[in-house]
A protein has these predicted regions:
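Amphipathic, interaction-prone secondary-structure segments
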Residues: 5-37
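Acidic, low-complexity intrinsically disordered segments
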Residues: 41-102
Length: 102
């Protein structure tokens, strides 16, 4: 089974946070907000306004108030993890990321 997603930064907020639009090969889409320090991820609108209470803090390592939809929950976790890793690797939030898993 192959899983794939791509995400692209669509906004850099005045606070330094990045807003990404993402999509999976299965057609699941959304937006994710990464804080300026690169440690907090939240689902959000395209304008960067948080949606719901879902929150991933990489310092803690688990999701608070996860989405009940397993597809959305899994995609959110994978995308947040990759963005956190790229921030650490590059020293800044990436412009775009694509990943494929087999």
């Amino acid at each position: 089974m192959t899983a794939s997603f791509s995400c692209k930064m669509i906004a850099s907020l005045d606070t330094g946070a990045g807003v990404y639009a993402w999509t999976t090969v299965e057609g699941i889409t959304g937006n994710i907000l990464i804080d300026p320090e690169g440690v907090i991820a939240r689902p959000c609108t395209a304008a960067g306004d948080p949606l719901g209470d879902t929150l991933l803090d990489k310092r803690v390592g688990n999701v608070q108030n996860p989405d009940p939809d397993p597809g959305v929950r899994t995609a959110f976790l994978k995308i947040a993890a990759v963005l956190f890793m790229e921030k650490e690797r590059q020293g800044r939030l990436p412009d775009a990321v694509t990943r494929t898993y087999w």
